[in-house]
């Protein structure tokens, strides 16, 4: 399996019993509605556990949670996913999240930064390259109008700047 090949599965749940307004239809409505609410609560709990493990760089815990079916894009109470809060210098962790389907282009709800902005700002070239190969966009500006290359330049990460300029030029 390639580094960015996504694993099948995740937390796909049957939402056929719910109409577009989210109300329940069908004979098993009470039971299914209760299960749906329970699922949302479980996913929220899983999102907290996954993001906490990712932020701490706990690769084994992240892997175990994903293998148990935790949605790789589940968010914590701040609305951030594991790939947004992960320990950026841990390339193995980034690869695992991406393999399980983490979305590299989800903007931070407050700053609009993508994980590539964070990797560029901190100078993590290997993580940045992996995110880019997984489809991360390099042309998205954060809420201050900065591109990942701007952040790398501000911090003096010359190798990151060179990489970003080269891939943008070759695109």
Swiss-Prot record:
ANK repeats lie at residues 45-74, 78-106, 111-140. Coiled coil: none annotated. GO terms for cellular component: cytoplasm; nucleus. It comes from the Eukaryota. GO terms for molecular function: cyclin-dependent protein serine/threonine kinase inhibitor activity. One of its GO terms (biological process) is negative regulation of cell population proliferation. Heterodimer with CDK4 or CDK6. Predominamt P16 complexes contained CDK6. Interacts with CDK4 (both 'T-172'-phosphorylated and non-phosphorylated forms); the interaction inhibits cyclin D-CDK4 kinase activity. Interacts with ISCO2. Acts as a negative regulator of the proliferation of normal cells by interacting strongly with CDK4 and CDK6. This inhibits their ability to interact with cyclins D and to phosphorylate the retinoblastoma protein. This is Cyclin-dependent kinase inhibitor 2A. It comes from Monodelphis domestica (Gray short-tailed opossum). The gene is CDKN2A.
